[in-house]
Amino acid sequence: MDEWMNYEQFDRQTWHGFFPTDSVRLTQGNLDEIKSLNDRISIEDVQDVYLPLIKLIQLRYQNFLEWQMQKANFLQRSTMRIPYIIGIAGSVAVGKSTIARLISILLNKMLPDKRVELMTTDGFLYPNAELKRRGIMDRKGFPESYDMERLLKFLNDVKAGEPVVKAPTYSHQVYDVQLDKPLVIDSPDILIVEGINTLQLPSNQQLYVSDYFDWSLYVDADPDLIEHWYLQRFGMLLDTAFTDPSNYYYPYSKGDRQEAFKMAKYVWQRVDLPNLREFILPTKSRADVILHKTTGHVVDKLYLRRG
């Protein structure tokens, strides 16, 4: 079966033509501040890819608000403030975090009267101590390593209009959850939820994370390219960790670099690549938009779900 049968495909030039404007002013310096270590994003990317994407999200959001008003009228009740939730999924090292931050900034500029907040599902990983207790430390990132019940409760509270909801955070520096440093989500109009597991359908659940999404994006790239970006990022992490003994990567930065990369490649092949193939890639067809990247993190194609 053709994996693209329910999508319309657009090349970059065609996509740009749907909203050919540069009305949102950003500098390359602004973009460098939000991009992840080895990611790449340019002013041309914003104009060609992301501004049309933001316009599409804006249209969907307007429809969402209209539906909330119509539903409230039908039920003969006052309109509640219900957050619009955007899910962003894709492999590790594919650039989800950069895209999520960029979308957040652009939405804030395009919708200045709306409160836009951003979070990652990494904080809902079980702490390392719990992963070790369960004997699944080597499965970190796989579906069973997440506290899905807690994540679902968080999303349910947000959708229910709870004014203040707290989410645990994750530190890539110490490679563990930070339960004592929660992220406070305070009455957002739009919430962006980024993570590898946002579109997954765990077999032991009747309720899924994506049930709470109003719109979703999958960031796609060839697995060989993602591996290259993964190892490139690992090298940059080594370069930034060698002066900080508290950093998870510090021991690797002080040891044999070739051995460190050998370890990273092993982790990719034994953990991240199987996770991508078995649990992340199969969720691609559940996204409203698929953003495809090629060499250098350049977006060359976009796929828009029909209907």
UniProtKB/Swiss-Prot annotation:
GO biological process entries: coenzyme A biosynthetic process
EC number: 2.7.1.33
Pathway: Cofactor biosynthesis; coenzyme A biosynthesis; CoA from (R)-pantothenate: step 1/5
Keywords: ATP-binding, Coenzyme A biosynthesis, Cytoplasm, Kinase, Nucleotide-binding, Transferase
Protein's cellular compartments: Cytoplasm
Catalysed reactions, as listed in the record: (R)-pantothenate + ATP = (R)-4'-phosphopantothenate + ADP + H(+)
Enzyme class: transferase
GO terms for cellular component: cytoplasm
UniProt GO molecular function: ATP binding; pantothenate kinase activity
UniProt: ATP binding residues: 90-97
The organism's place on the tree of life at top rank: Bacteria
HAMAP family membership: Pantothen_kinase_1 (MF_00215)
Xref: NCBIfam families: panK_bact
Family to which the UniProt record says this protein belongs: Belongs to the prokaryotic pantothenate kinase family.
Name the record gives this protein: Pantothenate kinase
Gene, per the UniProt record: coaA
